[in-house]
């Protein structure tokens, strides 16, 4: 003869199922929390890797001693071309060069033995030294691909210091990365003039967002010398959902003065 559950048995069963359900729910909640935390940390790590690798790739091809740091920004001058020369020119040129890339454009600037980042922005300041502006583009063809060419220049002062390896760097527009603390973001800026008033985000126009959730950012410049390359220390701290990831990265500038 069969019989059904008694009321007491049913109540006990419901209580036991509730306890098991709470236990399993707690385990599932912990697992979900671990997954969310892991995902948040991985997202921060990916952002940090992307930003440090992008900055390192650009900085390594910067004009030596062109890096400046101020107001949460780091600015540098990308090399658009380089060349070797035989003799220094007069202030009125021309400058006889053998460019690496066979293109020399009007209004590009060139520098021999760069020593000061601020001076690289200064032409046509009367105090600008070792710097000239190219006054006319040079057209390359089969007749001058492998020979030195005369590049028309105009300089505020004569060139007086030789490069140990007789190298010239050509550049045009600066690039800057700026940390906006109130937004906890880093933006990249380009296309603004060399004649900016100061190194600050309000001088650059609109920037491109490179990373966010940055609680701290610091840039330190170890300038180049004749014996060693320049070194840029990038210190970033990312924070989100209770997770924090710190990056201490060194970017080497490949070129020497």
Q: What is each stretch, according to the model?
A:
Residues 1-3:
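N-terminal leader/signal peptides at the extreme start of proteins
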Residues 5-60:
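Aliphatic-rich helix starts adjacent to a transmembrane/signal segment
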Residues 8-10, 17-21, 38-44, 143-144, ...:
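Generic detector of short, locally flexible boundary/turn motifs and exposed helical patches
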Residues 27, 50-52, 59, 76, ...:
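Long, contiguous hydrophobic alpha-helical segments, chiefly transmembrane helices and signal peptides
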Residues 31-33, 72, 230:
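A generic secondary-structure signal marking the coil-to-beta-strand transition
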Residues 36, 45, 169-171, 211, ...:
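Generic, ordered loop/turn and secondary-structure boundary motif
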Residues 41-187:
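Extracytoplasmic beta-strand-rich oligomerization domains located immediately C-terminal to a leader/signal peptide
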Residues 183-257:
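Short linear sequence signals and composition-biased patches located at protein termini or domain-edge surfaces
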